[in-house]
């Protein structure tokens, strides 16, 4: 594991206001080693160069850490585990549920979480609109679902009263924000700056219409 990647991750996390130990950083990078190995057998990610993986997978995921509320967080359409797996390493006191409709992706996540000792991660194989958990979640986050309104429509029932839906977006989604389902409102739109990434990033924070902002 090149020390330069450890340093890049630690410095980038610090710039994002996220406190990581060197052990945390090494666990995140170890998860990328597992991703590379599994990616040879199944297409989990098109990003194969390690510097880009650190930036576009790990630091991009950590860019939303300060908006996460616990103790229960759901990552919808987690894919290969982003943003949920890096956030779980950075926030060990919060329970993360990673949901996806593709079983093979969840098999990878279960393997990687076990390999790096992320005991606060569980997986669910279903679609968000079909998921009926015993307890709802304080935060529901996704960087995979398309339009913000669709995300809210599919996953809104999974969020507790007073909780937040967090949609990770690229450019400012002006038109999408005008098409939220009834009963929901935009609490805030945060412009994110991901260290090492020269691309626009925004986080849309959605809550129920009667919730205080």
Language-model region placement:
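Alpha-helical structural signal in soluble globular domains
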Residues: 12, 25, 90, 179-183
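Conserved SAM/SAH-binding loop-helix junction
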Residues: 63, 82-86, 104-107, 150
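Conserved SAM-binding loop of SAM-dependent methyltransferases across substrates and taxa
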Residues: 80-93, 153
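S-adenosylmethionine
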Residues: 93-97, 101-213
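Class I SAM-dependent transferase core
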Residues: 1-74, 104-121
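Conserved beta-strand/loop positions that form the S-adenosyl-L-methionine
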Residues: 76-78
């Amino acid at each position: 594991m090149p020390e330069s990647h450890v340093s890049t991750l630690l410095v980038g996390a610090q710039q994002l206001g996220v406190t990581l130990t060197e052990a945390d950083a090494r666990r995140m990078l170890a998860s990328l080693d597992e991703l590379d190995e599994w990616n040879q057998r199944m297409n989990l990610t098109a990003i194969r160069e390690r510097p880009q993986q650190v930036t576009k997978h790990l630091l991009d995921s950590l860019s939303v850490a300060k908006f996460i509320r616990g103790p229960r967080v759901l990552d919808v359409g987690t894919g290969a585990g982003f943003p949920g797996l890096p956030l779980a390493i950075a926030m060990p006191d919060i329970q993360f549920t990673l949901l996806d409709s593709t079983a093979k992706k969840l098999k990878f996540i279960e393997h990687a979480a076990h390999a790096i000792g992320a005991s606060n991660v569980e997986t669910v194989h279903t679609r968000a609109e079909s998921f009926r958990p015993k307890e709802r979640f304080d935060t529901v986050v996704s960087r995979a679902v398309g339009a913000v309104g669709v995300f809210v429509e599919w996953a809104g029932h999974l969020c507790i009263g007073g909780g937040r839906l967090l949609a990770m977006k690229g450019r400012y989604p002006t038109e999408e924000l005008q098409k939220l389902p009834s009963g929901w409102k935009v609490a805030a739109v945060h412009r994110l700056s991901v260290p090492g990434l020269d691309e626009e990033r925004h986080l849309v924070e959605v809550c129920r219409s009667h919730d205080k902002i």
